[in-house]
Design a protein with these regions (language model features):
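Carbohydrate-binding surface patches
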Residues: 2-11
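Rossmann-like S-adenosyl-L-methionine
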Residues: 12-216
Length: 216
Protein backbone atom coordinates (compact mmCIF):
# COMPACT_ATOMS: atom_id res chain seq x y z
CA UNK A 1 0.00 0.00 0.00
CA UNK A 2 1.31 3.46 -0.94
CA UNK A 3 -0.44 6.25 0.95
CA UNK A 4 -0.24 9.99 0.26
CA UNK A 5 -1.61 12.75 2.49
CA UNK A 6 -2.35 15.83 0.38
CA UNK A 7 -2.50 19.22 2.10
CA UNK A 8 -2.21 22.88 1.17
CA UNK A 9 0.38 25.28 2.53
CA UNK A 10 -2.17 28.08 2.61
CA UNK A 11 -3.20 29.38 6.02
CA UNK A 12 -6.89 28.50 6.59
CA UNK A 13 -7.16 31.12 9.32
CA UNK A 14 -5.66 33.92 7.23
CA UNK A 15 -4.29 35.82 10.19
CA UNK A 16 -7.19 35.02 12.51
CA UNK A 17 -6.77 33.17 15.77
CA UNK A 18 -6.89 29.42 15.27
CA UNK A 19 -9.72 27.48 16.88
CA UNK A 20 -8.78 26.25 20.32
CA UNK A 21 -7.63 22.64 20.24
CA UNK A 22 -6.79 22.66 16.52
CA UNK A 23 -3.56 20.98 15.40
CA UNK A 24 -0.74 22.67 13.57
CA UNK A 25 0.38 21.17 10.27
CA UNK A 26 3.39 19.29 11.65
CA UNK A 27 1.34 17.67 14.41
CA UNK A 28 -1.36 16.64 11.94
CA UNK A 29 1.11 15.03 9.56
CA UNK A 30 2.97 13.22 12.34
CA UNK A 31 -0.30 11.97 13.79
CA UNK A 32 -1.43 10.76 10.36
CA UNK A 33 1.77 8.78 9.86
CA UNK A 34 1.72 7.30 13.37
CA UNK A 35 -1.93 6.27 13.00
CA UNK A 36 -1.24 4.41 9.75
CA UNK A 37 1.81 2.66 11.13
CA UNK A 38 -0.15 1.61 14.21
CA UNK A 39 -2.51 -0.25 11.88
CA UNK A 40 0.36 -2.56 10.96
CA UNK A 41 -0.18 -4.20 14.33
CA UNK A 42 -3.28 -5.69 12.73
CA UNK A 43 -2.08 -8.92 11.15
CA UNK A 44 -4.04 -8.18 7.99
CA UNK A 45 -1.95 -5.06 7.36
CA UNK A 46 1.39 -6.23 8.72
CA UNK A 47 4.12 -5.35 6.25
CA UNK A 48 1.62 -3.93 3.75
CA UNK A 49 2.73 -0.29 3.75
CA UNK A 50 5.33 0.35 1.06
CA UNK A 51 5.46 4.04 1.82
CA UNK A 52 3.72 7.07 3.31
CA UNK A 53 4.13 10.46 1.65
CA UNK A 54 3.07 14.03 2.33
CA UNK A 55 2.23 16.04 -0.79
CA UNK A 56 1.81 19.81 -0.70
CA UNK A 57 -0.59 20.94 -3.41
CA UNK A 58 -1.60 24.59 -3.74
CA UNK A 59 -3.18 24.18 -7.17
CA UNK A 60 -6.85 25.12 -7.58
CA UNK A 61 -7.36 22.47 -10.26
CA UNK A 62 -9.49 19.37 -9.65
CA UNK A 63 -6.48 17.06 -9.86
CA UNK A 64 -3.67 16.50 -7.39
CA UNK A 65 -0.34 18.02 -8.33
CA UNK A 66 2.82 18.05 -6.27
CA UNK A 67 4.40 21.37 -5.38
CA UNK A 68 6.45 19.47 -2.83
CA UNK A 69 6.62 15.78 -1.86
CA UNK A 70 8.08 14.56 1.44
CA UNK A 71 8.69 10.90 2.16
CA UNK A 72 7.50 10.14 5.70
CA UNK A 73 8.07 6.39 5.73
CA UNK A 74 9.35 3.62 3.49
CA UNK A 75 9.79 4.33 -0.22
CA UNK A 76 8.02 6.31 -2.94
CA UNK A 77 7.03 3.33 -5.08
CA UNK A 78 6.09 -0.34 -5.12
CA UNK A 79 5.94 -3.05 -7.76
CA UNK A 80 2.75 -4.64 -9.11
CA UNK A 81 2.61 -7.71 -11.33
CA UNK A 82 -0.02 -8.18 -14.03
CA UNK A 83 -0.18 -11.02 -16.56
CA UNK A 84 3.45 -11.92 -15.93
CA UNK A 85 4.83 -8.38 -16.28
CA UNK A 86 6.11 -6.19 -13.46
CA UNK A 87 5.36 -2.48 -13.14
CA UNK A 88 6.93 0.16 -10.92
CA UNK A 89 4.10 2.22 -9.43
CA UNK A 90 4.58 5.66 -7.89
CA UNK A 91 2.13 8.18 -6.46
CA UNK A 92 1.34 9.82 -9.78
CA UNK A 93 1.37 6.69 -11.92
CA UNK A 94 -2.03 5.98 -13.42
CA UNK A 95 -2.70 2.37 -12.53
CA UNK A 96 -5.90 0.41 -11.99
CA UNK A 97 -6.40 0.05 -8.24
CA UNK A 98 -8.31 -3.22 -8.61
CA UNK A 99 -5.56 -5.30 -10.17
CA UNK A 100 -7.65 -8.50 -10.25
CA UNK A 101 -10.37 -6.89 -12.37
CA UNK A 102 -7.72 -5.14 -14.46
CA UNK A 103 -6.17 -8.49 -15.38
CA UNK A 104 -9.51 -9.73 -16.75
CA UNK A 105 -9.95 -6.52 -18.75
CA UNK A 106 -6.42 -6.53 -20.13
CA UNK A 107 -6.49 -10.25 -20.95
CA UNK A 108 -9.66 -9.67 -22.99
CA UNK A 109 -7.94 -6.90 -24.95
CA UNK A 110 -4.88 -9.12 -25.45
CA UNK A 111 -7.14 -11.88 -26.79
CA UNK A 112 -8.45 -9.44 -29.40
CA UNK A 113 -4.87 -8.93 -30.60
CA UNK A 114 -4.40 -12.69 -30.79
CA UNK A 115 -7.60 -13.03 -32.80
CA UNK A 116 -6.10 -10.66 -35.37
CA UNK A 117 -3.10 -12.94 -35.84
CA UNK A 118 -1.14 -10.69 -33.55
CA UNK A 119 2.49 -11.63 -34.28
CA UNK A 120 2.69 -9.22 -37.22
CA UNK A 121 0.03 -6.73 -36.12
CA UNK A 122 0.48 -3.15 -34.93
CA UNK A 123 -1.45 -1.83 -31.94
CA UNK A 124 -1.88 1.84 -31.07
CA UNK A 125 -2.34 2.63 -27.38
CA UNK A 126 -3.54 6.23 -27.39
CA UNK A 127 -3.40 8.23 -24.15
CA UNK A 128 -1.12 5.48 -22.90
CA UNK A 129 -0.09 6.97 -19.55
CA UNK A 130 2.76 4.95 -18.08
CA UNK A 131 2.29 2.30 -20.77
CA UNK A 132 0.67 -0.45 -18.74
CA UNK A 133 -1.81 -1.50 -21.42
CA UNK A 134 0.71 -1.16 -24.24
CA UNK A 135 3.17 -3.45 -22.51
CA UNK A 136 0.51 -6.02 -21.72
CA UNK A 137 -0.45 -6.10 -25.41
CA UNK A 138 3.17 -6.39 -26.57
CA UNK A 139 3.58 -10.18 -26.09
CA UNK A 140 0.65 -10.77 -28.46
CA UNK A 141 1.51 -8.11 -31.06
CA UNK A 142 4.20 -7.38 -33.59
CA UNK A 143 4.56 -3.78 -32.44
CA UNK A 144 2.82 -1.48 -29.98
CA UNK A 145 2.97 2.31 -30.20
CA UNK A 146 1.91 4.30 -27.15
CA UNK A 147 1.15 8.02 -27.33
CA UNK A 148 1.00 10.15 -24.18
CA UNK A 149 1.25 13.90 -23.67
CA UNK A 150 2.88 13.73 -20.21
CA UNK A 151 6.62 13.33 -20.73
CA UNK A 152 7.24 11.94 -17.24
CA UNK A 153 4.73 9.16 -17.90
CA UNK A 154 6.41 8.31 -21.20
CA UNK A 155 9.81 8.04 -19.51
CA UNK A 156 8.29 5.72 -16.88
CA UNK A 157 6.75 3.60 -19.66
CA UNK A 158 10.11 3.24 -21.40
CA UNK A 159 11.81 2.17 -18.18
CA UNK A 160 9.12 -0.38 -17.35
CA UNK A 161 9.22 -1.81 -20.88
CA UNK A 162 12.99 -2.18 -20.70
CA UNK A 163 12.74 -3.86 -17.29
CA UNK A 164 10.19 -6.29 -18.74
CA UNK A 165 12.44 -7.10 -21.70
CA UNK A 166 9.98 -5.76 -24.28
CA UNK A 167 11.67 -4.51 -27.44
CA UNK A 168 8.56 -4.09 -29.59
CA UNK A 169 7.13 -1.11 -27.68
CA UNK A 170 7.57 2.48 -28.82
CA UNK A 171 6.39 5.34 -26.63
CA UNK A 172 5.94 8.82 -28.06
CA UNK A 173 5.55 11.98 -25.97
CA UNK A 174 3.06 14.32 -27.59
CA UNK A 175 -0.54 15.28 -28.23
CA UNK A 176 -2.51 12.48 -29.93
CA UNK A 177 -4.01 15.05 -32.30
CA UNK A 178 -0.56 15.96 -33.68
CA UNK A 179 1.27 12.65 -33.31
CA UNK A 180 -1.23 10.77 -35.51
CA UNK A 181 -0.18 13.02 -38.40
CA UNK A 182 3.47 12.11 -37.88
CA UNK A 183 3.33 8.34 -37.29
CA UNK A 184 3.86 6.37 -40.50
CA UNK A 185 2.64 3.00 -39.21
CA UNK A 186 -1.01 2.04 -39.62
CA UNK A 187 -2.71 0.23 -36.74
CA UNK A 188 -4.57 -3.05 -36.89
CA UNK A 189 -6.12 -2.33 -33.50
CA UNK A 190 -6.53 0.83 -31.40
CA UNK A 191 -6.82 1.07 -27.63
CA UNK A 192 -8.27 4.29 -26.22
CA UNK A 193 -7.98 5.29 -22.58
CA UNK A 194 -8.40 9.08 -22.62
CA UNK A 195 -8.33 11.43 -19.61
CA UNK A 196 -11.44 12.87 -18.00
CA UNK A 197 -12.05 15.48 -20.68
CA UNK A 198 -12.12 12.77 -23.33
CA UNK A 199 -10.77 12.59 -26.87
CA UNK A 200 -10.06 15.86 -28.67
CA UNK A 201 -12.93 16.42 -31.15
CA UNK A 202 -10.44 16.91 -33.99
CA UNK A 203 -8.54 13.73 -33.11
CA UNK A 204 -11.61 11.49 -33.25
CA UNK A 205 -12.07 11.64 -37.07
CA UNK A 206 -8.39 10.73 -37.51
CA UNK A 207 -8.83 7.70 -35.27
CA UNK A 208 -11.99 6.58 -37.06
CA UNK A 209 -10.30 7.03 -40.45
CA UNK A 210 -7.92 4.17 -39.68
CA UNK A 211 -10.97 1.91 -40.13
CA UNK A 212 -9.69 -0.78 -37.77
CA UNK A 213 -11.85 -3.74 -36.82
CA UNK A 214 -11.26 -3.39 -33.09
CA UNK A 215 -11.24 -0.19 -31.01
CA UNK A 216 -11.06 -0.98 -27.30
Amino acid sequence: ILVALVTTSQDPWQGETAVEGSLDADALITGFKDLLLSLEQDRKLAGKFAGILHITNDSIADVVQSDRTELLYGQEYFYEELLGLKFKISTFSFFQTNSYSAEVLYQTARDYVGDLGGSDKTVFDLYSGTGTIAQLMAPAAGKVIGVEIVEEAVEAAKKNAAANGLDNCEFIAGDVLKVLDEVEEKPDMIILDPPRDGIHPKALPKIIAYDVEHIV
